[in-house]
Amino acid sequence: MEPAEDSLGATIQPPELVRVPRGRSLRILLGLRGALSPDVRREAAALVALAGPVFLAQLMIFLISIVSSIFCGHLGKVELDAVTLAVSVVNVTGISVGTGLASACDTLMSQSFGGKNLKRVGVILQRGILILLLCCFPCWAIFLNTERLLLLLRQDPDVARLAQVYVMICIPALPAAFLFQLQTRYLQSQGIIMPQVIVGIAANVVNVGMNAFLLYALDLGVVGSAWANTTSQFFLSALLFLYVWWKRIHIHTWGGWTRECFQEWSSYTRLAIPSMFMVCIEWWTFEIGTFLAGLVNVTELGAQAVIYELASVAYMVPFGFGVAASVRVGNALGAGNADQARCSCTTVLLCAGVCALLVGILLAALKDVVAYIFTNDKDIISLVSQVMPIFAPFHLFDALAGTCGGVLRGTGKQKIGAVLNTIGYYGFGFPIGVSLMFAAKLGIIGLWAGLIVCVSFQAFSYLIYILRTNWSRVAEQAQVRAGLKSTKELIPTPADLPILEREVMDGVILPDIIRPESQTGQLVVEENSQCAVPTVGEVLTGRQLVFYRGMALTVSVAVLIAGIVVRVFNDRG
């Protein structure tokens, strides 16, 4: 390139060009162009607008249990240990189950709303209410025997007895907590998040006030804190219901209670059960890890408790992006827009990855001081600082895995997530962590090293699966779930046949497959309509509905009765 002259006659030297291989240069330019395209920027803004309030709402819910621990911690060590164990029991055997089962709505509601089959969203909510209320009975059976379970785990008898008192008071709170989970999904599928934040703030104000009044004014101790927690759960559910009713958010999606809510339970549970395992496997692993840390020594337990709290708070950011992913991807697929779903998926992974990287760097930089938020014990602080360099990369992989899980929920592929979670945690990571913890005598440092194996396996497996996703095919399946297309309209290619066979387990019913619960059903589908609520799959007759739903109720109640019998037997023994 020859030198040129400007308007004043000065010589302008051409800039030096950096020689880059043509293929590599093209890839870099295309990557930058894609990352900075208007579509990606708009999508990132939409995702952040969803993820931010979800983070705040989740933080508000998390604070309710933390407040109970803080108040009871001032009563004494036994009271603090009892409340900590009681909250763990409620979370592991109750809240985690409801959270997982309600996650089926992330798929069904978001896809139906995206496909403009609005009344179907309300029917799915009704279906979820009935199924989750039935699931309360088995959870209550475990609640009734909390003391016995804790004694089997070699916990202090006084702590176990007091924990049983706390859990018993929380029994009526479980249906309220489940209903709140469903209400949250109902609003999230429509892109409505802020009401949960407002309600969460109000519930925390009520919780703090009731804890102070019941513990100090009435001197009720742990019992008072339990009642404050239970009241807060009812307050959350009731206030959110009143908000929906007052703002008339339900007008277009709620057609009143209908017999349709008794149909399609198989489709719901095919998504709900894998969703439950996606949530519970990880949740249970951390709770078990905390228990194992207590078997080493008190310092290890204290450090594990601190890191667990930090992990819970840090995970709320990718959790928010996971919810945003399930909503945006589900809405796009329900509308049949495969390109938008792909864009949402790519953008949310970039956003979550950047945020997780920043959080990981921050925690690593603050590794020597972050534990002072929770304790002044020098030994615990020192151990936490040793684990933080391991936790930082753990959080990055965990964030990617959690966000990918949101994408899988949006696409209706929870079964894949459940299988990969099981393999990652119980096939590889957790056994390695326990071996390093005890055999290698590394304590919780070894445990978290094993957990990195879990989440890295999850993250890479999820990413590979998502990269291989046929978005056009998934969009067609989403429209079947949304009641907009018949499965007969899906024209398979020979390569699709193995996939189609698996879709029966993912909630998409093929016309040539007969459900075990119906012999004479017919496929009913109506085209895109805001009023019609088609039943996807076979329609059960009235007699079949009474039999199968009656059996579900009978089994649930029988489990509760068995729990009562075990409790009575143990009390007499």
From Swiss-Prot:
MF (Gene Ontology): organic cation transmembrane transporter activity; polyspecific organic cation:proton antiporter activity; xenobiotic transmembrane transporter activity
InterPro entries, sorted: MATE_euk, MATE_fam
Localization per record: Cell membrane
Annotated keywords: Antiport, Cell membrane, Membrane, Transmembrane, Transmembrane helix, Transport
GO biological process, one term: organic cation transport
Biological function: Multidrug efflux pump that functions as a H(+)/organic cation antiporter. May mediate testosterone efflux from the Leydig cells in the testes.
Protein name as it appears in the record: Multidrug and toxin extrusion protein 2
Biological source species: Mus musculus
Gene: Slc47a2
